[in-house]
Amino acid sequence: VTLEYYADKKREYKSEPACYLGTVGSNANQIDWRVIEHPTGTARYRMAGINTKVDGKDMLVFIGGSTNPYNYNGVGYNGTASEPDSKVWVFSPGEKRWLTAADTTPVMDLRSLIEIDGEVYSVGGMTSGQQVSGKLIKHPIKLQ
């Protein structure tokens, strides 16, 4: 999310569809960041990611979020209620490309994902209708 400032009206929060891949070398305090292609061109706000194995290969998996940046109550900075996204984005570091995966349970306002016995879960967040959830939600990762 970026901020746009105007002389004649209130600032606006704008989505920024951007992806970066960082490589850590021998100095762990330095990361070489590179821009990589965005999988859709539409940014997601407060999604979460995890490094996990998918079909036996290391993958970066991103789940949930919303296309409308929002405040703590799930209402967008633009005054419109935000809804969670069901898309799953999978990036293959080995192939340096995005892969298509099946949708999952829509959830937003995530801080992280966890892995238990090879399965990916979100903890809490918000579900449809800006409902705060304390549930553990399993997200099967199925490449298409």
Task: Kindly give the residue locations of the regions a language model identified.
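Kelch-like beta-propeller repeat domains
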Residues: 1-144
